[in-house]
């Protein structure tokens, strides 16, 4: 496996074939303390960069048609877990207990990663959109910091980002809302999550990802017959 193959295959989207064996270097499980609180959206946006510098993980949910944000920060701790563990809120537990989120209500979701330095302005535009054109939306908007990586086609390639996620109930119409949000995300150089809703063409994807051509070159070299391309990826490559 060549080095450029490895770099591309870390985000392979199922298009590089089946992985039959992998050797992983792991770390020991560790304990995390989660702290949650409510604040106004303006206060939260104003303090968000400081919160990110002070905590390992930082995110919040804003509830449309209100000024309320539910903030969540997570840090490593030496404190002992306390059971029964609350589903969310202020709690201490093992990493595999605290990091996952329980989401029992079915919904659709669009998530874009926006450069960290532009994310607050983007969020304000999303807020204005909801206040003006989509007042019926009750699902919260999620705002979460994420560090840069070096993975080809990653939404966080080469830069720190904030992921902004919008949601709608599974039985509700989502396309007008999501398309309006996507227009805003793209105006802030956003990149879509590969596993969630987007409406982009292959040409648009290529303009967003500087490693697009090299990723496809590696993919096509590994699978020239295109056996592992699904309908969605074929639509992007045509």
Q: What are these model-predicted stretches?
A:
Residues 1-140, 145:
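C-terminal substrate-binding/cap subdomain adjacent to the FAD-binding core in PCMH-type
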Residues 26, 66-70, 120-121, 148-153, ...:
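Flexible loop/turn segments at secondary-structure boundaries
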Residues 43, 117-121, 125, 173-176, ...:
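Generic recognition of stable, solvent-exposed alpha-helical segments in well-folded globular domains
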Residues 72-80, 147-159, 203-212:
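Short glycine/threonine-rich loop-to-helix capping motif typified by GTGT followed
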Residues 91-108, 141-162, 227-238:
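N-terminal flexible segment immediately upstream of the FAD-binding catalytic core
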Residues 122-134, 180-188, 214:
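Generic non-transmembrane alpha-helical segments
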Residues 140-198:
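C-terminal hydrophobic structural anchor segments
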Residues 191-238:
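Activity-critical C-terminal alpha-helical subdomain
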């Amino acid at each position: 496996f060549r080095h450029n193959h490895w770099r591309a295959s870390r985000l392979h989207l199922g298009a590089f074939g089946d992985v039959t064996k992998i050797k992983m270097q792991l770390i020991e499980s560790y304990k995390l303390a989660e702290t949650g609180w409510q604040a106004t959206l303006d206060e939260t946006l104003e303090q968000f960069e400081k919160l990110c510098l002070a905590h390992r993980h930082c995110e919040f949910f804003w509830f449309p048609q209100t000024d309320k944000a539910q903030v969540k920060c997570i840090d490593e701790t030496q404190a002992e877990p306390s059971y029964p563990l609350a589903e969310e809120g202020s709690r201490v537990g093992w990493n595999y207990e605290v990091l996952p989120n329980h989401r029992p209500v079915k919904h659709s979701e669009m998530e874009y990663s926006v450069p960290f330095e532009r994310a607050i302005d983007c969020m304000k535009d999303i807020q204005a959109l909801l206040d003006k054109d989509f007042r019926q939306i009750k699902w919260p908007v999620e705002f979460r910091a994420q560090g840069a990586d070096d993975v080809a086609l990653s939404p966080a390639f080469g830069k720190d980002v904030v992921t902004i996620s919008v949601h709608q109930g599974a039985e509700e119409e989502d396309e007008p809302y999501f398309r309006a949000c996507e227009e805003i995300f793209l105006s802030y150089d956003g990149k879509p999550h590969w596993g969630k809703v987007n409406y982009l063409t292959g040409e648009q994807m290529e303009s967003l990802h500087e490693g697009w051509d090299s990723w496809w070159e590696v993919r096509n070299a590994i699978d020239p017959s295109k056996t592992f391309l699904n309908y969605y990826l074929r639509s992007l490559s045509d």
